[in-house]
Amino acid sequence: MAGHSKWANIKHRKAAQDAQRGKIFTKLIRELVTAAKLGGGDVGANPRLRAAVDKALSNNMTRDTINRAIERGVGGGDGTNMETRIYEGYGPGGTAVMVECLSDNANRTISQVRPSFTKCGGNLGTEGSVGYLFSKKGLILVESADEDALTEAAIEAGADDIQVQEDGSVEIYTAWEDLGLVKDGIEVAGFKVVNAEVTMIPSTMVDLDAETAPKLLRLIDMLEDCDDVQNVYHNGEISDEVAALL
């Protein structure tokens, strides 16, 4: 596992995301509805739905809202056939970028995604151009815990890897299908999970300086502002020193 903090890069963007909470909720609900529609409403038998529920909870969505979205999906939703599409490309500084979309119209989606890359000095690549650099994983964050006890609980719950960060927080990596089970095991052991989500972990990182980092963040902002875009993954590394200058 690459020795970097995925959560640190997420935190750099939390303030901006909080300002777009309404749009984030819309995208979370769309994923909940689609996951339930495709795989049923039982979170125990539907890993995609369980992952969607965990992510919604991490973003402070209420259980009532989550349950209503699941019920919509089980009932067939609104009749729209949503499909997951992954677009790959290169961002500023040679960073690898993967864009996960949920859409009923591929032409509309690509017309949103391609200009974002172009305007930020990047370019949209072909399928497989950067995907080989990423692995789909579950990521769980626990803040300030007894390292030995948490490690034991995480391993017993089925975690693949555990990384302690400089600030004392612990990042726990799992097979994406096991995210819910591992999260449950950690919580049963008495630890508070701050965040749990399915993500794409890069095998190599690209260090970004104070000139390049804002360009990548602008690209991410533009992509996430697209209605069809659910998640944006990249291998840009933004140090605390560079982040402080942004």
Swiss-Prot record:
UniProt entry keywords in alphabetical sequence: Cytoplasm, DNA-binding, Transcription, Transcription regulation
Subcellular location: Cytoplasm
Signal peptide from the UniProt entry: none
InterPro entries named among the record's database cross-references: Integrase-like_N, TACO1_YebC-like_2nd/3rd_dom, TACO1_YebC_N, Transcrip_reg_TACO1-like, Transcrip_reg_TACO1-like_dom3, YebC-like
Coiled-coil regions, chain positions: none
Listed GO biological process terms: regulation of DNA-templated transcription
Main location: cytoplasm
The UniProt record lists the keyword Cytoplasm: yes
Record flagged with keyword Cell cycle: no
Gene Ontology cellular component terms for the protein in this record: cytosol
A GO term for molecular function: DNA binding
Pfam families: TACO1_YebC_N, Transcrip_reg
Highest taxon, organism lineage: Bacteria
Family indicated by similarity: Belongs to the TACO1 family.
PANTHER family: TRANSCRIPTIONAL REGULATORY PROTEIN YEBC-RELATED (PTHR12532:SF6), TRANSLATIONAL ACTIVATOR OF CYTOCHROME C OXIDASE 1 (PTHR12532)
NCBIfam families attached to this UniProt entry: PRK00110.1, PRK12378.1, YebC/PmpR family DNA-binding transcriptional regulator
Name of the featured protein: Probable transcriptional regulatory protein HSM_1763
